[in-house]
């Protein structure tokens, strides 16, 4: 647990806490500990310390090479703006140089950007009769159009309490790109049905 940046310590205090505590956490739990945060103000200091002390950072909470990495490693992406493969290449070089090779990742294309583009395309194709509503293969083709090289997967939301799938809500994910290694191929893995019954 860490201080809330909206509390009296502010953003600076919350960031300082992460900078100071991460080395102790790595020492206590080991370098094979995966760190994660949902507080955007704490992402940059966490990335810095994870790289410096050799721990693992799978991906940001809103996965994107723009989420925390440029600020944490002083990366200027002015020339690469709008070019996701070039952005990933430059961020990857900085992460590897900082010591995060094979231990830090992200989605190669911003979650927000790619989902906005894909859903607009999906709606367009449905109206044109080129895609069917609730057809995941058609949806993945729309994601693929805007995210070459990245794989996508997902499934309709399953309400465990009611025991039903809700086809109107699809949980999607892009394969994680690990800097210095490439894609994890996590989207190739099938989630066993038995996990739909865990309460």
Label every PLM stretch briefly.
Residues 1-199:
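A residue-level marker of the well-folded mature domains of exported/periplasmic proteins
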């Amino acid at each position: 647990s860490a201080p809330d940046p909206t509390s009296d310590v502010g953003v600076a205090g919350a960031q300082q806490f992460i900078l100071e505590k991460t080395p102790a956490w790595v020492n206590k739990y080991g370098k094979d500990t995966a760190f994660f945060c949902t507080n955007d103000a704490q992402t940059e200091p966490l990335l810095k310390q994870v790289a410096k002390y050799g721990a693992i950072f799978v991906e940001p909470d809103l996965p994107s090479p723009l989420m925390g990495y440029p600020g944490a490693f002083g990366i200027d992406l002015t020339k690469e703006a709008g070019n996701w493969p070039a952005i990933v290449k430059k961020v990857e070089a900085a992460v590897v140089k900082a010591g995060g090779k094979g231990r830090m990742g992200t989605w190669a294309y911003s979650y927000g950007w790619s989902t906005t583009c894909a859903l607009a395309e999906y709606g367009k194709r449905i109206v044109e009769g080129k895609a069917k509503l609730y057809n995941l293969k058609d949806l993945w083709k729309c994601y693929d159009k805007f995210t070459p090289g990245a794989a996508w997967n997902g499934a309709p939301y399953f309400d465990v309490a009611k025991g039903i799938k809700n086809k109107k809500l699809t949980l999607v994910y892009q394969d994680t790109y690990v800097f210095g290694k490439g894609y994890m191929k996590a989207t190739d893995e099938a989630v066993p049905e038995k996990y739909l019954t865990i309460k």
